[in-house]
Regions:
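Transmembrane beta-strands of outer-membrane beta-barrel pores
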Residues: 1, 38-44, 53-54, 83, ...
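Signature of Gram-negative outer-membrane beta-barrel scaffolds
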Residues: 1-29
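Residues on the lipid-exposed face of transmembrane beta-strands in outer-membrane beta-barrel proteins
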Residues: 22-26, 77-83, 131-137, 151, ...
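Repeated loop/turn-to-beta-strand initiation elements of outer-membrane beta-barrel proteins
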Residues: 26, 31-34, 87-91, 141-145, ...
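Surface-exposed extracellular loop regions of Gram-negative outer-membrane beta-barrel proteins
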Residues: 30-76, 97-115, 230-245
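Outer membrane beta-barrel strand-and-loop segments of large Gram-negative receptors
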Residues: 64-66, 70, 90-148, 158-162, ...
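C-terminal beta-signal and adjacent terminal beta-strands/loops
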Residues: 217-282
């Protein structure tokens, strides 16, 4: 590690930002609520992003922060719909659009001696349109369904560096819980994910899943759970490819997927029961 010699470095930065926000909501009945919000936000670069130290993890790459990074400023408009139905059906859906100026991104380029340099920069303007949904439903006395999902499109524009990139991203995470007699519970979870990539980069999706069994003893005081995470896969493969004018790089990570666990918990004493009422307009 070494720090470039530069006596003119100035690490002081003073800024003022106007951050307005507004919201409105409508409750047509006791099952539906609509929220419309507008907000602004500031995201400042982290110490790691600003750190000018140069790191040489190997003979082909260099990693360095950028002390000249500016904070990114975002505007967001979102419409949220909350629905409460029979059998404890709960649905929350949001549609949003955001615009971000001076968006901070990690990127890479080919430097001297054909070394790939990884750093951070303010990459023009980012546009994002997305839909997210959260569902929870007691379909029967013995069955509970839940799911989280999102899908969106992300666009990066920076004319000075010739960047005009559009990418889709998505996620879907369902779960099933079976409530069986004699205080047995069985369940399964899954997940499919693809994140929005860095500039000039394409990401591959990843998936994971798990199963569990739970049994309560001693009037619910003792709980025993057995969990199996991705039992049929040894690794989760994560891959991304960056294409530059002079070089193309592919990074592949193999994350340990398969694992098993046993959890024991015991509750001492019994507290007083309290009736809790939920304000469904929140």
């Amino acid at each position: 590690l070494h720090l470039p010699h530069n006596s003119t470095n100035d690490f002081n930065n003073h800024n003022s930002y106007l951050m307005p926000s507004a919201s409105a909501y409508w409750i047509p009945n006791n099952k539906n609520t609509l929220y419309l919000t507008y907000s602004t936000s500031i995201t400042r670069p982290t110490v790691q992003m600003l750190n000018p130290f140069i790191s040489n993890p190997n003979s082909n790459t260099i990693r360095q922060g950028n002390p000249n990074l500016k904070a990114q400023y975002s505007h967001e408009v979102a419409l949220n719909w909350f629905f409460n139905g029979p059998h404890n059906l709960s649905l929350n859906t949001s549609i949003s659009y955001s615009n971000t100026n001076k968006i901070i991104h990690n990127y890479s380029y080919l430097g001297e001696n054909n070394k790939v340099i990884y750093t951070y920069g303010n990459m023009g303007v980012g546009h994002n349109i997305g839909v997210t949904t959260n569902l929870r439903w007691n379909a029967a006395e013995w069955l509970m369904l839940s799911a989280n999902g999102s899908i969106g499109i992300n666009k990066l524009e920076a004319a000075d560096i010739g960047l005009n990139q559009t990418d889709w991203y998505y996620s879907f995470a369902p779960s099933l819980d079976f409530l069986l007699p004699k205080q047995f519970r069985l369940g399964m979870n899954g997940g499919l994910y693809k994140n929005a990539p860095a500039p000039w980069t394409e990401n591959k999706h990843i998936y994971m899943y798990s199963f569990y069994a739970n049994k309560s003893f001693l009037k619910g005081r003792l709980n025993v759970s057995i969990t199996a995470n991705s039992p049929f896969n040894k690794y989760i493969k994560s891959s991304s490819t960056t294409t530059l004018p002079d070089i193309m790089t592919t990074q592949t990570n193999y994350i340990t997927a398969r694992s098993f666990g046993i959890n024991l918990s015991y509750s001492f004493g019994s507290g007083q029961k309290v009736n809790v009422q939920r304000d469904r307009t929140l």
